[in-house]
Amino acid sequence: MKLTELLSDSYNAEEWRNKGYELPQFDIKAVRKNTFENPTWVHFGGGNIFRAFPAAILNDALNTGKYDRGVIVAETFDYEVIDKAYTPYGNLSLLVSLQSSGTIEKKVIASVTEALKADPQFADWKRLTDIFCKPSLQMISFTITEKGYSYNEDDLARGMTPVFALGKVTALLYERYKAGRLPLTVQSMDNCSHNGNKVQAGVFAYAERWAKDGLVPQEFVDYLKDESKITFPWSMIDKITPRPHEKVKALLAADGFEDNDYIETTRHTFTAPFVNAEETQYLVVEDHYTNGRPPLDLGGVLYTTRETVDKVETMKVTTCLNPLHTAMAIFGCLLGYDLISAEIADADIRALVQKIGYIEAMPVVVDPGVLNPYEFIGAFINKRLPNPFMPDTPQRIASDTSQKLSIRFGETIKKYIARGLDKHNLILIPLTLAGYARYLKGIDDVGKPFTPSPDPLLDELQSIVAPLEIGSKKQDFSCLKELYSRKDIFGLDLYEAGLGEQIEAFVKELYAGKGSVRSVLHRYTTTR
């Protein structure tokens, strides 16, 4: 069983279906012909998240029979991905959905019609410029990570031959401008807040510099800033696509599926002809398009307003996901866990995240309307965290904790104060913040040293708690004032907020001796 069999006229579809593979319900060749002649969507970034999510959503839309165009993928960074993960397999891939039950679902993704290397050194660049001149083109999108939107003075100074992704995209947009100032929507699908603004800032930076240097007319800049022509909508995306999993490879091999080799490029991109991803997914998009759009709502995309996208992001970051992750990271490191899926099976940890989410944070949740906050937390705790295929660790999540506490917990505390809510309802959030002072000590609950995760303030904050000793009966905890009054870390002075003394009391309990983290966590999660 090979993916390219599906491009022949005489493959054994029944064999695939009998082994649990969901096959495309559309004419692949017809979709490719339609897309070549009248393309509607180019996506930059051919990595695992693209194949597992945007491409899969379009595949589902095509399966309805209500749409007939695919997506053209363009790679701006690692061109070997095209040569090794797309071309040998006819641009087909296998999506393996990893269920929390430990089972998998398998679906062939056939929505990608072309895979191009987005750089002038390759012949594909001519094809890309032709596509950008097509009136039919509606949207370009990105999954290139937040770092992919970066640019610098050297690249701005290179003129019309930039190296960075957004410079190349701006050059292609200039081709579209010259073709008749054609409309287009520039859509980020990367997991970063206000992502449309990041794309917009980069594109404007290149265009304005080129205009200043006399390389393009000022009218090109005006075209990019005309929202009747070009828009940069926001989106919120949430789906985990880990590296190809050994267990998945073995399960596919047992089926007789031959395209199961791992691929590592010289730039250390890890991929495969298959992509494995968690079952849960969310993509909420600002509906601000200038030339129509592919009907991705047929595949589950939620189209809404910019304000609602922002509310979904706020719900996730301040209440329903990120704070729970950080609470697990702090206590997971202290209790010796190295896998999130194992940690959530701990009754005390499970109670911690459930009660932070449902009892303490939920009273001030931003309800976006398009997603139910209670259902979002439920899916996170019951499906996503326990998934045995997800290799996430508390140590990874604990990275840069000092930069995260303000958004993940400080915002909730601020809302309690602003709304005059009873701060006595806050027990496990203060306990988590107290746990941070215990975590900074770098000694786990059984007395074993561990290395705290990388953090720009780690040395500074560890020096604050340096006078504290675990198990010392008489010690001065006044150093905590220096920590918990830090507005740059917590978003507010926790003493002024009326929580400083409560947090100090928790810290004293957590420093009482070996086993105190477990006993304190158990006591407060069971009595909460």
Segments the model singles out, each with a brief description of its role:
Residues 1-44, 48-528:
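Substrate/ligand-engaging "lid" and interaction regions
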